[in-house]
Regions:
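Extracytoplasmic/periplasmic substrate-recognition and gating elements
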Residues: 62, 89, 249, 287-350
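Hinge/lid segment of periplasmic solute-binding proteins
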Residues: 102-153, 296
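Short helix-initiation/N-cap motifs at beta->coil->alpha
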Residues: 73-82, 173-178, 255-269
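Glycine-centered hinge/linker elements that transmit conformational signals in sensory
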Residues: 225-256
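Short helices/loops that flank or line small-molecule/ion binding pockets
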Residues: 80-92, 110, 161-162, 181-185, ...
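Extracytoplasmic/periplasmic solute-binding protein
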Residues: 144-146, 177-228
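C-terminal capping/gating helix-and-loop segments adjacent to ligand/active sites or protein-protein/ligand interfaces
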Residues: 351-357, 361, 369-423
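Conserved N-terminal structural module of periplasmic/extracytoplasmic solute-binding proteins
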Residues: 2-107, 291, 304-306, 346, ...
Length: 426
């Protein structure tokens, strides 16, 4: 499947003006009497949007006097299996973060299939979504997820650190390796890598796969679905080799497996590295750690032809309503607020993303100029896992990448294991 309808959306969004996943802790609005049922004005919420959900909750409470939101924030690797367990046991909150498509344990297809999510097809914003985004909210023809932001993955550079090092962002694969060598020689590694959090392991690989795999074969996913291609006998092998070449060249700080996502943010924000390969959502978190810093997302090159470079870009995680929500009316009110101009703009401003709807009036963030350009010129591919048949493929990839970095596995073994999980189907 090719992302060939996104440019229309971005052109509209910018005329009036892209696995996500963040690490966090727990926070809560003050409770009100009465628990979550009946006439209660308390909404329960589980989120993975560290650094942005806080402002959205405040805005929602302000717009709805008397309403209080009790919410928790946690990282994707902890959140995804946890929310599935809570839904199965009947202890899940009213509203929760849910990912598009079918690629992880908290993805729309995975949670809607057993009946855990409320059908949102009748909500006013659903038919305003572009087809490429709307399809990822659906299971069996019904929409279940409020997707508010478009995100991209690439190299996010600390501009001040670059200037101090006297370096500029690379446009080709050869330049990238030279950039890493020069940065290492100056004592400031090119990129922070927080592979202690397993979801982070995929981001460099996805950035390389976008160009290496889809540049010459935009229909690779269709071939996989038809049984005509495999991970192990495709340019995925090249992309994975390039990932490890970056590691051997010194593109990352020492001990990525011992570095958390939170710690990697600090390295990039404070100039201990020149940047970080992440989604655009990290920009807001870097600015929190360094308010005076300037951070810019650029494509990560994988070949020596800049014209062939592609960026992974797609709708990020959104919000869904528990089919057994204790306060269903308030839950619907919240997801509709998320999809309103106020709610959507609050989210995308904090996350440094782009709105999924074109009528919010939001001006594009300058830090996303290259992402906006790539989407507008049809140079993007979906996040790879969103089109995989089950969450096991991604889970195998994430654990396997950690094992490769620890010397316990090999690229060939990992890709064979991913193929086996892919072929196992839904």
């Amino acid at each position: 499947m090719k992302t060939r309808t996104l440019p229309v959306l971005i052109a509209a969004a910018t005329s009036v003006a892209v696995l996500a996943a963040c690490s966090g802790g727990t926070n809560a609005g003050s409770d009100s009497p009465g628990g979550g049922g009946g006439g209660s004005q308390t909404l329960t919420l589980a989120s993975q949007d560290q650094g942005s959900i806080e402002d959205v909750v405040k805005a929602f409470e302000k717009a709805n006097p008397g309403v209080k939101v009790k919410y928790t924030v946690s990282g994707a690797d902890q959140y995804q299996p946890q929310i599935r367990t809570q839904l199965a046991s009947g202890t899940a909150p009213d509203v929760m973060s849910v990912w598009p498509g079918n690629g992880n344990p908290a993805a729309t297809y995975v949670l809607a299939k057993p009946g855990y999510l409320r059908d949102l097809s009748d909500q006013p914003w659903v038919n305003k979504l572009p087809a490429s985004v709307k399809s990822l909210t659906e299971y069996d023809g019904k929409s279940y997820t409020a997707l508010f932001g478009l995100n991209g993955i690439g190299a996010v550079y600390n501009q001040e650190a670059l200037t101090k090092a006297g370096l500029t962002p690379p446009d080709t694969w050869t330049q990238l390796l030279d950039f890493c060598k020069a940065a290492k020689a100056k004592g400031t590694p090119a990129f922070a890598l927080g592979n202690q959090d397993n979801w982070v392991t995929q981001l460099v690989l996805y950035s390389l796969v976008a160009t290496t795999v889809y540049g010459d074969d935009p229909d690779f996913d269709k071939q996989m679905q038809a049984g005509q291609a495999t991970f192990a006998k495709s340019p995925w092998t090249t992309a994975l080799d390039k990932y490890l070449t970056m590691e051997k060249t010194g593109c990352f700080q020492k001990n990525p497996l011992g570095t958390s996502y939170e710690a990697s943010q600090t390295l990039a924000a404070t100039g201990k590295t020149l940047g970080i390969v992440q989604g655009n959502w990290v920009i807001a978190l870097l600015k929190e750690k360094n308010p005076k810093g300037t951070f810019t997302l650029k494509a990560l090159p994988a070949t020596d032809d800049p014209a062939k470079t592609l960026i992974p870009a797609a709708a990020g995680a959104g919000y869904a309503v528990n089919a057994k929500a204790k306060n269903p009316e308030l839950a619907l009110k919240f997801v509709n607020f998320v999809m309103s101009p106020e709610g959507m703009n609050t989210f995308v401003k904090k996350q440094g993303s782009l709105p999924t709807l074109s009528d919010t009036g939001l001006a594009a963030d300058p830090s996303l100029a290259e992402l906006t350009k790539f989407i507008g010129s049809d140079r993007t591919v979906p996040f790879m896992d969103q089109l995989w048949p089950n969450p096991k493929v991604q889970a195998t990839m994430l654990s396997g990448l950690q094992e490769i970095f620890s010397g316990q596995s090999t690229p060939g073994k990992l890709l064979d294991e991913m193929d086996a999980e892919y072929k196992s189907g839904n």
